[in-house]
Amino acid sequence: DWLRKRHLSDTSQRGDNRFVRVSWDEALDMFYEELERVQKTHGPSALLTASGWQSTGMFHNASGMLAKAIALHGNSVGTGGDYSTGAAQVILPRVVGSMEVYEQQTSWPLVLQNSKTIVLWGSDLLKNQQANWWCPDHDVYEYYEQLKAKVAAGEIEVISIDPVVTSTHEYLGREHVKHIAVNPQTDVPLQLALAYTLYSENLYDKNFLANYCVGFEQFLPYLLGEKDGQPKDAAWAEKLTGIDAETIRGLARQMAANRTQIIAGWCVQRMQHGEQWAWMIVVLAAMLGQIGLPGGGFGFGWHYNGAGTPGRKGVILSGFSGSTSIPPVHDNSDYKGYSSTIPIARFIDAILEPGKVINWNGKSVKLPPLKMCIFAGTN
């Protein structure tokens, strides 16, 4: 029905129609005709240009090529953030000064040489390093082999904080890895209880907090329960997390006793209020006072892009820019009071509730009335 009537078709049939094969020439003509119609009739606030991850390589970059192609035609609604790290990449610049999730991680040789405890918090290195933003070379796996040998020899202890047994946990050996099977979405109570133990047992680094951090005195009253009457101790967290209180205290003591590398993944920050978890990872690392020391501190990108392999000095070719200096076919820049950029995961909200005002990254966003959504490199 849509092939015959386009935007005048019966939308009640949407999702029930059979697949109809057309030639590439027909498909491209239909796409451009609809692009023209929406741009001329409704303007840029009705067009969404969105991408997810990319195809491997710099030229076949879905997001860049789509942005360039649509920019040659006219303005559209863009997207901000990404599906991978939507919460962490917003909060961490305000906490540590950079996005952190895509930063270079401490090299594995330094970790293997200096770390005594590695905490995998929602991070499955073995599974996720199969993919890569560039062309995966899997060099990092040789360091996982070295880690496995050191774990088996008792030189490094690995603790996995995860509701499930991950591929990395299985690879390193169930008999060697300590599993903290936290209840889903209760990671922050566990973090608070660890922080409470570090503070109450005087295991935290006062000098590091005094010299390199700000705001601990604002965090402390909440941690101690001075405002709500509930100390965030291990006994409190046990009821929420499903983790025995003494296990929580023991974990805090172990992390403070020697050089501890916190390896945080991205999955936990995708839950509701996930930015609090990312923030608390930094709080714990700061209380331990090991940020900047070899084999200590925290990182959020160890499972990605061969992280931890020593960097190369060679030049990396940049990709094609999504912008263009060529004047577009249509120069309409009137978004009619709607936002020109929306969070990438909120396009469904824009379709269902156009005009709704939401908060995002400290700003108000007015969702536009979308009539056409153009996706490339996403599912």
Over which residues does each language-model region extend?
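N-terminal export/assembly segments and adjacent metallocofactor-ligating motifs
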Residues: D1-L203, N332-S333, F347, K363, ...
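Scaffold signal of the M16-like zinc-metallopeptidase fold and its non-catalytic homologs
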Residues: Y196, E201-A234, Y335
